Amino acid sequence: MQDILIVVDMQNDFIDGALGTPEAVAIVPNVLKKIESFSGKIIFTRDTHQENYMRTQEGANLPVPHCIENSFGWQIREGLLGHGEIAVLDKPTFGSRELGEMLLELEQQEPIGSICLIGLCTDICVISNALLAKAFLPEVPVSVDAACCAGVTPQSHLNALAAMKMCQIAVENE
């Protein structure tokens, strides 16, 4: 059995850049500790937008340019990569179909014992990818480490954790 850690969008723009929050800054040490101590396979996702972001549906609904490909804000926080990750998946929207497909491939190679998600933002991309993992592999236990996540607001973080619990996603370290 293999265990999977998915590190969602731990990018400069979500930590202390265009969409950063004090809560996001505060989880960085927890995220690093979790990555360093994890003995399974690690996959990162990276929110990736283009220069035309403001002309996209997301840009119309969230008119704050962020994670523009190859910008500083798009980069994963220094120090988090380089701990044996097997992939960094760029994604143009909240959930990553490529992540779901990779999880299926990994499951075919060796059964997955657990999937844990950490990162940003709890209420947008973490919940989207947690539900996606549950949809692709409904019999694999999926969890989220709340101490390694932050939402757009503290309340939306709590709302997302409650919603994930209702969908049989375990919440650790609440």
Annotated model-derived regions:
Residues 116-120, 141-154, 174:
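A short glycine-rich beta-strand->turn/loop micro-motif centered on a GG-aromatic cluster
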Residues 47, 94, 147-149:
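Active-site beta-loop-alpha junctions enriched in small/polar residues
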Residues 70-124:
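Internal catalytic-core helix/loop-beta-alpha segment
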